[in-house]
């Protein structure tokens, strides 16, 4: 299982900038890309995977992000919205913290909101 967190961004996101803003927070994190896989992976200095970040996808169908995530009408979801999904290994509090910090930096730079699996 994974801890999933999604940035729902008003403006087209720049994940590289968000990754760069998170690297100093945990001291010694490294970022790399994976051919044919997520845009980036963030790793702990000991080499363990903390976060996988997927490419941004533009969701153009009105209400689709709300429907997919089960978000109620009381929450305003931008439209159209850029969807950036990240996954952290389950049971690793540091990985969840890095995932939340990344998504907060991403949404902070683009406007929007985040959703998580918990």
Regions found by a protein language model. Name each.
Residues 1-118:
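Acidic (Asp/Glu-rich) sequence patches and key acidic residues
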């Amino acid at each position: 299982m994974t801890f999933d967190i999604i940035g729902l961004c008003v403006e087209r996101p720049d994940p590289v900038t968000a990754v760069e803003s998170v690297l100093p927070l945990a001291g010694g994190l490294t970022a790399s890309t994976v051919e044919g896989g997520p845009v980036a992976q963030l790793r702990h200095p000991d080499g363990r995977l903390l976060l996988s970040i997927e490419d941004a996808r533009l969701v153009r169908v009105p209400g689709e992000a709300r429907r997919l995530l089960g978000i109620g009408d009381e929450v305003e979801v931008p439209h159209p919205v850029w969807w950036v999904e990240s996954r952290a290994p389950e049971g690793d509090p540091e990985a969840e913290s890095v995932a939340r910090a990344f998504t907060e930096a991403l949404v902070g730079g683009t406007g929007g909101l985040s959703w998580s699996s918990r």
